[in-house]
Amino acid sequence: MESQIKKIHQQLVSKEITCTALVQGKLDLLQQNTYNSVNSTLDVLALELAAKVDAKIANGETIGLLEGIPFGIKDVYMLQGTYTTASSDLLKNYKSPYTATAIQKLLDAGAIPLVKENCDSFGHGSSSENTIFGAVKNAVNPELVAGGSSGGSAVNVAKKYTVFSIGGDTGGSIRQPAGYNHIYGFKPTYGRVSRYGLMAYASSTDCVGPLAKSIEDIRIVLNVMSGKDPKDQTSIASTEISEEAISVSSIKTVGYFKNFIESEAIDAKIKADFLAAIEKIKAKGIEVKELDFFKSDILVSTYYTLAMAETASNLSRLDGTNYGNRIEAENLIETYAVTRSENFSEETKRRIVGGNQVLSQGFSDEIYLK
């Protein structure tokens, strides 16, 4: 599919459409949607920003490529003054006091935030069913799950409610729902995009990434968000990806992990489609190498061990003291216990308990360090 960003940009510049009409139309679609993809819409902010874009165009001023382009935000990113709930009871009334670096860069480029998007609570899940706002429905077939945890973001892009959305990927949470909803999702190299302002799940693998209907739009958005950030010590400086780097590739060799695709867990159709894609790559004269990695059956257990350990640590701060839906009890210890047990989802509690177990004395050497 062609770049929607470039198409809309040209329509705005040529005055074929107004930014206000564009934004209002998208907001109407979001508010009327039946896919449970929306946690909250940002009507006032979005229309204020749209009016400013229209004023610039009316005055003959040049607008940037992302200026006036409507986008969605997975509800785990801070955007000052908006609800950031992580689709959880604990933070259902929490308002962001600041804005995430990646989101701020998009705002600085003129993009217009429309919506905070439904997702698995705190990113804990792969179906977008683990949320207080109701399970997200698949954009292709509403009888199926949307994937997760960035399910709402993927559905909104697929249904053209947003031009692009910003999701989060720890262990497939952008790429998997993108695939489920027939769009593109990209997990960048760790550190390419600052994590500042993203609610931490597993900090050593959390990544900020875009979802869109074209690779070109992924490229445009990624370039804007990328870069070293003094607020995130793991962030790195990176080279901008040019349009030519994608359209005129100099890649001569591609590798894939043969043991992954041969796993019994892979659906037959997915395996067939993957191998068909490999043949298309070969047909372009690119050498394809079969690689071996460590056993595929220990991948999931390795991921869960690390992710549960880190999320147990990261979510220990959420006890209702400084923020969140505090539930008072007879004493402080019971207040902490009731606040967390009543406000965390079953899946989140499973991951916290599992994380505390693998980090506890006697288990850390046997499980975590192994």
Feature-to-residue mapping (PLM):
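Conserved hydrophobic/aromatic pocket- or pore-lining residues that grip, position, or stack substrates
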Residues: A46, K74, L106, G134, ...
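A short helix-breaking turn/cap at a secondary-structure junction
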Residues: K187-A272, E334-V338
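Residue-level signal for inorganic ion chemistry
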Residues: K26, A46, T99, I218, ...
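Acyltransferase
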Residues: C19-Q24, A51-D54, E243, I266-D292, ...
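Short alpha-helical scaffolding segments that buttress acidic/His motifs in well-ordered protein cores
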Residues: L22-K26, T302-Y303, T348-N356
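Short glycine/serine-rich loop segments
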Residues: T99-A100, Q104-M225
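Short helix-loop capping/hinge segments that flank enzyme active sites or metal/cofactor-binding pockets
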Residues: L66-A86, V248-F257, A309-K370
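Short, well-ordered alpha-helical
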Residues: M1-K95, F122-H124, T234-A237, E243-A245, ...
